[in-house]
Regions:
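Short glycine- and acidic-rich boundary segments immediately preceding or forming the N-terminal edge
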Residues: 1-54, 158
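Conserved beta-strand scaffold positions in the cores of enzyme catalytic domains, especially
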Residues: 39, 55, 108, 158-160, ...
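Glycine-rich, often proline-containing surface loops adjacent to acidic residues and nearby aromatics
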Residues: 66-72, 226
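Short glycine-rich or small-residue beta-strand-to-loop segments that form or flank ligand, phosphate
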Residues: 70-77, 232
Length: 264
């Protein structure tokens, strides 16, 4: 079946509609009639609708186990356009394919750093001066929104998309806190890498290329794992989207299967 939402997102992006409103418009329209897709707006300190950060929530079909909860974040740096694009298309695919989304709940912020995005800057001057990292008392609005989100639900996995202009292929760095996650997600990434040429990944790296941004989460009973996916500038937006989807879907399936089997 043709995924018209995904097609609209791709066509609008190729036509130059890379701003947040243009990017998410097809998803927001689809959410009006969807049984699984919800669009929300996370409030900031101004409480103004125009300053709220948009997010999407996919609630997959009921399964005989607690849902696997995953948070996906893109656009942490305001001049990124490919990580938001990849997330938008990922959500469109999850909404369309009930088999992929069954037993999972996914919350996605395509453009977390809305302020920097609107100024087309990596970070704003204020964010550079005061810091823009979680759990370091940052006053940045997007940081506070994500911190609240990480305490709102007991997430199993946080996926952070970043653009790496120096990378020649998509790579991933993975921080696995729980022993069960080390087994389940480690095996899933190993299997994915065996079938995917040029995909590199590291578990709990001592000298990471990307600093993890969201974990460890303070004052929670169980830590989520964090996967940082670096998008290679050598790939086209379409190729990057395919890479992201392949990695995320492999991890979702592994977590869901493990929970269903009582191994998670």
């Amino acid at each position: 079946m043709l995924n018209t939402t995904d097609l609209l997102i791709a066509n609008r992006f190729e036509a130059g509609h890379t701003d947040i409103d243009g990017l998410i418009a097809p998803l927001a329209e689809r959410a009006q009639d969807s049984a699984s897709l919800i669009v929300g707006y996370a409030p900031t300190s101004t409480r103004l609708r125009e300053d709220a950060i948009p997010y999407f929530h996919i609630c997959g079909a009921y399964a005989e186990h607690p849902p696997v909860r995953v948070l996906i974040v893109g656009g942490w740096f305001g001049n990124e356009v490919r990580s938001p694009y990849a997330i938008a298309r990922l959500i469109a695919t999850l909404e369309m394919d009930e088999a992929l989304s069954a037993g999972v709940e996914v919350t996605a912020f395509p453009v977390a750093n809305l302020v920097a995005n609107r100024s087309n800057s990596y970070l704003t001057e204020e964010q550079i001066a005061t810091g823009a990292r979680c759990w370091e008392d940052s006053p940045a609005e997007h940081v506070k929104v994500i911190e609240r989100e990480l305490h709102r639900y007991p997430y199993d996995l946080v996926v952070f998309l970043r653009e790496n202009p120096r990378a020649l292929e998509t790579d991933a760095e993975v921080w696995l806190a729980e022993e069960s996650h080390k087994r389940v997600l480690g095996a899933a990434l190993k299997a994915y890498a065996a079938e995917t040429p040029n995909f590199r990944w590291k578990t709990n790296p001592t000298t990471p290329v990307y600093r993890r941004s969201f974990t460890p989460v303070p004052k929670v009973a169980r830590q989520p794992s964090e996967v940082v996916i670096g998008l290679s500038a050598a790939g086209s937006p379409s190729e990057q989207t395919t890479d992201v989807a392949g990695i995320v879907f492999a991890l979702l399936k592994a977590l869901r299967d493990a929970r269903q089997a009582g191994a998670l």
